[in-house]
Swiss-Prot record:
Increases the formation of ribosomal termination complexes and stimulates activities of RF-1 and RF-2. It binds guanine nucleotides and has strong preference for UGA stop codons. It may interact directly with the ribosome. The stimulation of RF-1 and RF-2 is significantly reduced by GTP and GDP, but not by GMP. GO terms for cellular component: cytosol. It comes from Shewanella baltica (strain OS223). Keywords: Cytoplasm, GTP-binding, Nucleotide-binding, Protein biosynthesis. One of its GO terms (molecular function) is GTP binding. The lineage of its organism: Bacteria, Pseudomonadati, Pseudomonadota, Gammaproteobacteria, Alteromonadales. The gene is prfC. This is Peptide chain release factor 3. Gene3D superfamilies: P-loop containing nucleotide triphosphate hydrolases (3.40.50.300), Peptide chain release factor 3, domain III (3.30.70.3280). HAMAP family: Rel_fac_3.
Amino acid sequence: MSGNKVEVDKRRTFAIISHPDAGKTTITEKVLLFGNALQKAGTVKGKKSGQHAKSDWMEMEKDRGISITTSVMQFPYGGALVNLLDTPGHEDFSEDTYRTLTAVDSCLMVIDSAKGVEERTIKLMEVTRLRDTPIVTFMNKLDRDIRDPIDLMDEVESVLNIACAPITWPIGSGKEFKGIYHILRDEVVLYQGGMGHTIQDRRVIKGINNPDLEKAIGSYAADLRDEMELVRGASHEFDHAAFLKGELTPVFFGTALGNFGVDHILDGIVEWAPKPLPRESDARVVMPEEEKFTGFVFKIQANMDPKHRDRVAFMRVCSGRYEQGMKMHHVRIGKDVNVSDALTFMAGDRERAEEAYPGDIIGLHNHGTIRIGDTFTQGEKFRFTGVPNFAPEMFRRIRLRDPLKQKQLLKGLVQLSEEGAVQVFRPIDTNDLIVGAVGVLQFEVVVGRLKSEYNVEAIYEGISVSTARWVYCKDERKLEEFRRKCSQNLALDGGDNLTYIAPTMVNLNLSMERYPDIEFAKTREH
């Protein structure tokens, strides 16, 4: 057990959250650069150089310059082993992001310093609040003109309801960006442009009162001293206990594109972020130091390797140790499986995992038996909780251009729904197929992937569906009566769960009044 504890103590598993275009994928690249996982960072937008960002590996992401699926990357840094989960930056992919946040122990929140707190960031912070996830904040894009840093921190505190403790402080911004002052280390790190793709030594001046500071940045030195007097009086000091409870966030400033300030964030994560945490199950709390292996699946990704048309289930290890060839118990289906070919990830590059410990993410080859939310143990029968499915907000009927490909269409849709990209509903009374999504872009992704991966050309038609609810009832007789009377509004989802498809909210409310013994659920545990 002591060997396990040593490995657990080394792990830091975190995700990056942000509003689209705040620079999340760029910062992912630079984090990997500092972790020696990349020799030269790709940049996301424009892509004239042909360097696609390493974490945006799916074809559609490369075309659009947005992160659609969750990538997992592991690298060593500062004596720790860091697992970074890159989440979709586009607002349409909140479900995938939500599930990813159930698999991490801390988050890095990236904010565009010219814009401040944006809508998507607010939503994601609400999700992290559900588990009191510790948050590290990075104020990005200092190489552009930014809002007043004190105003930015005030906004984070008032809008996101979390105290801010500045760790670094900017000196100028935009064309006048000179560098940052590291408050805890009492040193100024000078900025130099044009160093975005490689790691080079920066000039560091020790001490805010060092006369060399005037020589380096002129009148900005006196301004910095004045500003720091103000900042110290107006802001919180870093409190590790408050950070671990999700009540306070350490704030770093920098520019991901200029590769500046990223190492400070990583230093902070390694030093302060929690090691793998205990996990709730429906039977007990599972401690990471336990000897027996446990884990849960938070994502399924189809066709990570177009050459092999495979599916991989992403599993967070919660306790014990994975060893190549070990036997695992797949709790939902009650079967034991031998796993000899689990994978580790470097964003699309896959290597066979010899071993893995709590906090690590491994990939299991999935031939249709594994679903999101599945728990694996070494024999114990319990289920990890807290991996939800949300009722979709948009619906379309999907039609084939070639009616003979109905079988391939259904197979493709079921596989895409199993990986959580979209939800599929098959009405009980008709042969229609209804696709439900959280945002419009998901519909485009599904049609694109059906064509490229399943050779199926499909189109959408409008359908009068406003919302969906999963239907439950303990009384089998009442459920059967409900099925008979409301069959025109009932469908089965991709997992064959009974679902009520409501044409309007009025219709849903009337049905809920008419059938008080039936539960109409907005979310469903996987």
